[in-house]
Regions:
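Solvent-exposed interaction patches of small proteins and small membrane subunits
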Residues: 1-88
Length: 88
């Protein structure tokens, strides 16, 4: 069973998938390219956001398990990592 973060990521990707299906319909109905490109950008951003969330969650959990063994120094390193990782 996926954890809360993975459930949220799955929901985000399902929304992006639905949005992508709508874009296919836009193309099939001859909608203007500028509108299609705008919608594609939105889907691309949603997928990129989901990817980042998944990677951050995985790294955070993996490092948390590793650093728990390192005591206070490890916890400080984990906090530093989390602070900088948001800029990835």
């Amino acid at each position: 069973m996926p954890d809360h973060a993975h459930s949220a990521i799955a929901r985000r990707l399902k929304r992006a998938n639905g949005h992508l299906e709508t874009i296919v319909e836009m193309i099939e109905h001859g909608r203007p390219c500028a509108q299609i490109a705008q919608q594609l950008q939105a889907v691309e951003s949603a997928i990129e956001s989901a990817k980042k969330a998944l990677i951050h969650d995985h790294l955070s959990h993996s490092l948390e398990r590793s650093f728990k063994l390192s005591g206070a120094k490890g916890q400080a390193a984990l906090r530093d990592f989390r602070a900088i990782a948001k800029y990835l």
